[in-house]
From Swiss-Prot:
It is found in: Nucleus. It holds the Pfam family BEX. It comes from the Eukaryota. The gene is Tceal1. Keywords: Nucleus, Transcription, Transcription regulation. This is Transcription elongation factor A protein-like 1. Residues 1-101 are annotated as: Disordered. May be involved in transcriptional regulation. Modulates various viral and cellular promoters in a promoter context-dependent manner. Does not bind DNA directly. Belongs to the TFS-II family. TFA subfamily. InterPro entries: TF_A-like/BEX. GO terms for cellular component: nucleoplasm. Residues 33-60 have a biased composition (Acidic residues).
Length: 165
């Protein structure tokens, strides 16, 4: 019995020694920092996944330039604001509410001459007499009238049906 008591007494002492060693290992500053880093990495990965769900990079690159620039990327993927604007395709159409006719300057004949280059050679490229100038202007006006008539006929044909096409 004395042997069993001594064995029992030795066991608690050995467990106390093990317990004392474990807290010493847990309290080392290196381990504490690594645990905090791991927990912060877990949180940051969760935040990144939630941001990716709500703000996918493919859909909103122009709305989030600061986020795109601040992320850690290889140098070829990281775009500065200058490069973002240079890489964009220029707008082919004017912004909403602004028609092309408001953007263009000049008289009707000048615009027509710009649109259809064959008129430039007919009217502006030659020295015309007054009669020839009048005749060329009459031809242009006749073309304009025919165009308007065709537009009106098309408009009436579209609206003369009981149901839309």
């Amino acid at each position: 019995m004395e042997n069993t008591r001594s064995e029992n007494e030795e066991q608690p002492e050995s467990t106390l020694k093990i317990d004392e060693e474990q807290p010493a290992v847990e309290q080392s500053p290196e381990n504490q920092c690594s645990e905090e880093d791991q927990s912060s990495e877990d949180l940051s990965s969760e935040e990144q996944s939630s941001e990716e769900e709500f703000f996918p990079e493919e859909l909103l690159p122009e709305l989030l330039p600061e986020m795109l620039l601040s992320e850690d990327r290889p140098p070829q993927e990281c775009l500065s604001q200058k490069n973002q604007f240079e890489d964009r395709i220029p707008m082919e159409q004017p912004p909403c509410g602004v028609g092309k006719h408001k953007l263009e300057e000049g008289s009707f004949k000048e615009r027509l001459a710009r649109i259809r280059p064959q008129f430039i050679g007919d009217i502006h490229g030659r020295n015309l007499s007054n009669e020839e100038m009048i005749q060329a202007a009459d031809e242009l006006e006749e073309m304009k009238r025919v165009r308007n008539k065709l537009m009106i006929m098309h408009w009436k044909a579209k609206r003369s049906r009981p149901y839309p096409i």
